[in-house]
């Protein structure tokens, strides 16, 4: 999953595991590629910020309820909560894709998501002359020896390939989102329809693309199919019916399994030289890779701002501080003795034992049996030998006498068992104890002695 929880902020980008998101409470979606939506589904129930086009795709494809989707206009600054301002910038990657420029007490952070650098980005007012404290960079093509042409040059290569095969049907392998611009360019260049599946046609209309797509077989020379369909066996079967060439527009290394499969270096990610140009122009204080792994940091270090040693304090917002302090406090608390002992004995089924107070004191009436400090709600008798405690829960107004005496009922509440049911003066807290718990040997011995004490003389 290509997502990030940004440290020192309440921000998570393309990260949809709430359980692992820590204190993040502001969730952003950069674009709708599947590797950036892992964990995002129709059950999502928190505000989610994205571009308007991504918002439409999100509801259409993943059925995320619209009440949780917060579309933000691209090119404008938006106050999100009380601590963060965000500006969405075109990422030049796929329809609806954006970069996020975050500003707050944590400094200024640019999160590129997946992006293809263009010199036009240097004319973006939100970035021009801006100090960037942290740059989260798409390092997909961070390979010094991996040169890539611009997308316009790659599209020209595809057109030249098609011209060399005038009698062939052309099948182009694409993912569920992306390469739409290439398909439109080729359709207009050759004056033909692009045949697609019904679901893809529905998405093309949602994206409001030019009307060059159809589902009618045989209506056009160019077909757009899922990239997984471009393989040896399908090429064999297609060429039996009609001469066919396949095009894979990708900047990634791919193993070609058929002589009629052609790779065109059309990439929606920045090349290594473009990344260097972008970082050199931006001069961030630090660079952090979005795609985990080797990101050739040394290649960018020389372009960092000379102020990179003077980063602003990455203060944790108050809601995060409270959460961290509470977690720290709970971790430092010592477990009471009975919790430790409970692991050594099976707890009687159907009985719930409340946690004891940390301090216990010796009871005068029972040898070897201790009682914890009592509060106004409950009394308890514990055997330290067996690690078992028994409780007598009462209304707040009930109070206990000295050990060995009977419990007196308060004026505002009554015990569930009256004195008339038990002619002896045996304390009720023992009579209400579960019988299977009373089988503990040391406690039974103490009870036996207690019964002997109260036998009529």
Curated annotation (Swiss-Prot):
UniProt record, GO biological process: double-strand break repair via nonhomologous end joining; interstrand cross-link repair; protection from non-homologous end joining at telomere; telomere maintenance; telomeric 3' overhang formation; telomeric loop formation
Gene3D superfamilies in UniProt: 3.40.50.12650, Ribonuclease Z/Hydroxyacylglutathione hydrolase-like (3.60.15.10)
Protein name: 5' exonuclease Apollo
Written domain comment of the UniProt record: The TBM domain mediates interaction with TERF2.
Family indicated by similarity: Belongs to the DNA repair metallo-beta-lactamase (DRMBL) family.
Gene: DCLRE1B
Subcellular localization: Chromosome, Telomere; Nucleus
Nuclease is among the record's keywords: yes
Motif (TBM) on chain: 425-437
EC nos: 3.1.-.-, 3.5.2.6
Organism: Gallus gallus (Chicken)
């Amino acid at each position: 999953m290509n997502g990030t929880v940004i440290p020192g902020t309440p921000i998570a980008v393309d990260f949809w595991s709430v359980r692992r998101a820590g204190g993040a409470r502001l969730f952003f979606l950069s674009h709708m590629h599947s590797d950036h939506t892992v964990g995002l589904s129709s059950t999502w129930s928190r505000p989610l910020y994205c571009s308007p086009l991504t918002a439409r795709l999100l509801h259409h494809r993943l059925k995320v309820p619209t009440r949780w989707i917060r579309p933000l206009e691209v090119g404008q600054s938006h106050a999100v909560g009380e601590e963060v301002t965000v500006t969405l910038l075109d990422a030049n990657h796929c329809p609806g894709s954006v970069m996020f420029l975050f500003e707050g007490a944590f400094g200024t952070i640019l999160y590129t998501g997946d992006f293809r650098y263009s010199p036009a980005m240097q004319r973006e007012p939100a970035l021009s002359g801006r100090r960037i404290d942290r740059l989260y960079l798409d390092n997909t093509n961070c390979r010094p020896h991996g040169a890539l042409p611009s997308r316009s040059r790659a599209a020209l290569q595809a057109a030249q390939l098609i011209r060399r095969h005038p009698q062939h049907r052309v099948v182009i392998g694409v993912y569920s989102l992306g390469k739409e611009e290439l398909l439109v360019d080729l359709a207009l260049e050759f004056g033909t329809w692009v045949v697609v599946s019904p679901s893809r046609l529905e998405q093309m209309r949602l994206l409001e693309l030019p009307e060059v797509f159809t589902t009618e077989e045989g209506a056009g020379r160019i077909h757009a199919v899922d990239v997984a369909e471009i393989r040896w066996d399908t090429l064999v079967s297609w060429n039996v019916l009609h001469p066919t060439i396949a095009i894979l527009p990708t900047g990634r290394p791919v193993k070609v399994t058929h002589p009629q499969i052609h790779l065109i270096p059309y990439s929606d990610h920045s090349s290594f030289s473009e990344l260097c140009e972008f970082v050199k122009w931006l001069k961030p204080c630090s660079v952090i890779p979005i795609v985990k792994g080797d990101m050739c940091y040394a290649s960018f270090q020389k372009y960092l701002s000379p102020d990179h040693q003077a980063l602003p304090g990455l203060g944790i917002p108050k809601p995060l501080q409270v959460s961290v302090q509470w977690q720290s406090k709970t971790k430092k608390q010592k477990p009471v003795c009975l919790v430790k002992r409970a692991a050594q004995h099976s707890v009687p089924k159907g009985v719930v034992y409340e946690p004891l107070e940390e301090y216990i004191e010796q009871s005068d009436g029972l040898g070897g049996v201790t009682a914890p400090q009592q509060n106004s709600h409950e009394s308890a008798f514990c055997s330290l030998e067996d690690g078992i405690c028994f409780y007598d829960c009462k209304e707040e107004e009930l109070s206990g006498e000295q050990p060995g005496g009977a419990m007196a009922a308060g004026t505002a509440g009554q015990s569930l068992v009256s004195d008339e049911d038990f002619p002896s003066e045996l304390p009720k807290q023992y009579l209400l104890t579960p019988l299977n718990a009373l089988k503990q040997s040391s406690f039974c011995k103490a009870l036996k002695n207690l019964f002997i004490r109260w036998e009529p003389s």
